Structure formats: structure tokens, C-alpha cells
Amino acid sequence: MMTLYSFSTEVRLRCAADYQGVFDGALFKVHQPHFLFLAKPSEQLQSRLGVIVAKKKVRRAHERNRIKRLARESFRLHQQQLGLLDIVVMPKIGIEAVSNADLHQQLEFAWQKLQRQAKKYQKVAVSPSLH
């Protein structure tokens, strides 16, 4: 079976309520030097991604677009391994000066951390309680 690596509308957080759900119910947080990732288990059939790049954090539009593009592309390639998560990615101040290669590396580490946290959570949620 061929794995799909598309970034269709089904894998995007689209409305404010989707984003608010992640902010309010974030069970997983991953801090990287230039990114913050928030995630919660998804109620959908696949992982979804939302990227927030505030003008206050990244002044130039082409830099905001570059950051969003890198985050989306990295997610697209890792979405099959992440399990069912709704994820919001937010850059930190100073990200404009970082090279694409460094950002790719930070994104790789973040996906790995999220994957480990989600697996640990699933084991705890599935394991029978000892009463």
C-alpha cells in the first residue's frame, strides 16, 4: 500500500475553534530553540497541523511564509508516524536569522519528541488501572 504524503485540507486546523481546542487541551508541549509545539489527541481520522506565525514575532512576510512552508513540509513527511494528534506550531522570536537546515533539524527533533510523548500517553491511557 502506498503511503500518502499530501497536505490536503483534512490535515489542517482550519477554524478558530480547532486552534482553541489545542490551546485549551494541549497534553503535549515540545520546546525547541526556535519553535513551540502544542498538541492534543485528535478526534479526527488523521493528524492535523496549524501554524501560527505572528507579525509581532516575525516582521517580514517572506520570512513568515518561509517558516510556515518549512513547518508544513516537515509535517507532511512525518504525519504518518505521529499518530492521531492535532498540532499547533508557533515560532519564537529570533527565528528569522536561522537557516533552513537548522530549522529542519529542530522540526525533526520536535516530531520525534511528540511521537515519544504520544506513545507514552497511549500506553498510560490503555494500560488497565490497578484497583
From Swiss-Prot:
Top EC class for this record: hydrolase
Q: Which GO terms describe its cellular component?
A: ribonuclease P complex
Record's keyword terms, sorted = Endonuclease, Hydrolase, Nuclease, RNA-binding, tRNA processing
Q: Name one GO molecular function term.
A: 3'-tRNA processing endoribonuclease activity
Gene Ontology biological-process annotations: tRNA 5'-leader removal
Q: What is its EC number?
A: 3.1.26.5
Which InterPro entries does the record match to this protein? Ribosomal_Su5_D2-typ_SF (IPR020568), Ribsml_uS5_D2-typ_fold_subgr (IPR014721), RNase_P (IPR000100), RNase_P_CS (IPR020539)
Domain of life of the organism in this record?
Bacteria
Q: Which reaction does it catalyse?
A: Endonucleolytic cleavage of RNA, removing 5'-extranucleotides from tRNA precursor
All disulfide bonds of the chain are none
- Annotated NCBIfam families: rnpA
Assembly description: Consists of a catalytic RNA component (M1 or rnpB) and a protein subunit.
State its role. RNaseP catalyzes the removal of the 5'-leader sequence from pre-tRNA to produce the mature 5'-terminus. It can also cleave other RNA substrates such as 4.5S RNA. The protein component plays an auxiliary but essential role in vivo by binding to the 5'-leader sequence and broadening the substrate specificity of the ribozyme.
What family is this protein classified in? Answer: Belongs to the RnpA family.
Q: Provide the protein name.
A: Ribonuclease P protein component
Gene name per UniProt: rnpA
